[in-house]
Amino acid sequence: MVMTGGGGGIMQAGHEGAGRENSFGLNIQLPFEQQANPIIEGDPKLIHFKYFFTRKLFLLKESDAVALFPGGFGTQDEAFECMTLSQTGKFGPVPVVLIDRPGGDYWRSWSEYIDKQLLHKGLVSPEDPSLYTVTDDLVVACNAITRFYQVYHSSRYVGDRLVIRLKIDLSEVEVEQLNANFSDILVTGRIEKSQALPQEAQDETFDLPRLVLYFNQRDLGRLYQMIAAINNMGTPSPEERGHPERK
């Protein structure tokens, strides 16, 4: 399922690739510029928004991955909203990929600005660039998304504990490696293997193995780095490898 702003250009291309039946369009009501593309026009899954902030909420709320392409102020607004929500734990974890045309420098220049004006001045954490991937290669972009769900499935909080659902069970040695490398993100205790907690009895992911930890809810870049480390552990079967949307 693909969700776009519902307009032309790259938004229409997303709908063409997914097909009308697998597309949502979240259009914005403007007196100029933004018209629904012919793929989604007239479809009940085309939704019109008066305000940008509610549109952004719906774009992100159910998304399992975000792909951003070069654009104007609206694109920058959506990009920084996505980064802010990811950095503060209000959204995700999900893969966020900034995709340019081959040889393009739109996102590379953006990334250089982030490094110079934010990262080097201590306005964001050194790990925050781990929240996103910048590329002009579609293969790299696709791999960044699929690789994010190689072993990691999804996560939620149960009280103060972060529960990370996995597609395969990790070994004790692998969990020990995570504790050795990521103890800095813990408030207390250790990263531990677990089955579903009692509060998850009705969860559709009940049978999946889990990791449970008291995450400090601050170092989200480090959490993304830990997810990357988890995805380098083990090799799920083709049946286990499917995206969370395809349960």
Each PLM stretch: what is its role?
Residues M1, G9-P70:
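Acidic/glycine-enriched connector segments
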Residues M1-I28, F206-P209, I230-N231, T235-H243, ...:
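Glycine-rich beta-alpha loop segments
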Residues M11-G14, G104-Q117:
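Glycine-rich, charge-decorated loop segments at or immediately adjacent to ligand/cofactor-binding or catalytic sites
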Residues N22-Q34, F69, M83-W110, P126-E127:
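Short, acidic/small-residue loops that bind anionic groups at enzyme active sites
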Residues K45-T54, S130-A141:
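Short acidic-hydrophobic, aromatic-tinged amphipathic segments that line or gate anion-handling sites
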Residues F49-L98, H153:
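Active-site/ligand-binding-proximal alpha/beta "capping" segment
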Residues L57-L68, Q117-D136:
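Conserved thiamine diphosphate
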Residues L131, L138-K247:
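SAM-dependent methyltransferases
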